[in-house]
Amino acid sequence: MVKHIVTFKLTGTPEERARVAAAFRDALLALPSQIDVLQSMEVGINENPAESWDVVLIAVVPTLADVAIYANHPAHVAAAGLLAGHKADRACVDYEFCCRRLSRQYGERGLGIRSGCL
C-alpha cells in the first residue's frame, strides 16, 4: 500500500483561504466513490493560526503506480482545479507501508491483501 500525503499553502485572506480549503476538502472527500484505486481519503484543514500550511490530504492507494492513476483521473483533476489561483505552495510525500494492522481493521476488503504485504 502507498500513502500519498500532500500539504498545501493557500493565498488570500484567512476568510478566502477557509472558503477555498472547505470547497477543496469536500471535493477530495467525494473522490473514493469515483476513483477505483483510491482506498481511502482523509483531508484536514489547519486549525492552528500559528502554523503556515492550510490543508493536508492523506490518500491510500495499492501501489505507487496507482498514485499516477489517481492524480490523472478527471475527478481528481477537477478537484485540484479548485486551487487554481489560490495555491502558494505544495509539498508531497509518497511512501509504501505494510498494512497488516489495517487488514485486521478492514478484513477481507483487501487493504494489503491485494498488494501482498501480508
Region spans (language model):
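Short S/T/G/P-rich N-terminal loop/turn motif that feeds into the first structured element of a domain
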Residues: 1-54, 62-69, 95-118
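C-terminal structural segments of small proteins and small subunits
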Residues: 64-93
